[in-house]
Amino acid sequence: MNVKPLGARVVIKPLEKEERTKSGIVLPDTAKEKPQQGKVIAVGPGRTLESGTKVELEVKEGDTVIFSKYAGTEVKIDGEEYIILDGERDILAIVQG
């Protein structure tokens, strides 16, 4: 994938949740919750303040992050699903460990 997000945007590959319940029932797509975790695939250069100072994002490529449930724009690139998020507003936390 060759995508470079602009500004403070981040490209995320959502992590899919289990498609079966603990009792073994297969969940249809309509019953699945939207993923809220994903892996950072690409990071924009950050935001520019009015003074001209560049503010880089705290996340980097390879980080696993938790993001707002209905945030971002879903896109399909090379047949794969991705979400483009505002890296400052939509990403809530970096998963460590």
From Swiss-Prot:
GO CC annotations, alphabetized: cytoplasm
GO biological processes: chaperone cofactor-dependent protein refolding
Keywords assigned: Chaperone, Cytoplasm
SUPFAM superfamilies (alphabetical): GroES-like
Cystine pairings recorded for this chain: none
Main localization (coarse): cytoplasm
Alphabetized InterPro entries for the sequence: Chaperonin_GroES, Chaperonin_GroES_sf, GroES-like_sf
GO MF assignments: ATP binding; metal ion binding; protein folding chaperone; protein-folding chaperone binding; unfolded protein binding
Function text: Together with the chaperonin GroEL, plays an essential role in assisting protein folding. The GroEL-GroES system forms a nano-cage that allows encapsulation of the non-native substrate proteins and provides a physical environment optimized to promote and accelerate protein folding. GroES binds to the apical surface of the GroEL ring, thereby capping the opening of the GroEL channel.
Family: Belongs to the GroES chaperonin family.
PANTHER family xrefs: 10 KDA HEAT SHOCK PROTEIN (PTHR10772), CO-CHAPERONIN GROES (PTHR10772:SF58)
Name this protein carries in UniProt: Co-chaperonin GroES
Organism: Symbiobacterium thermophilum (strain DSM 24528 / JCM 14929 / IAM 14863 / T)
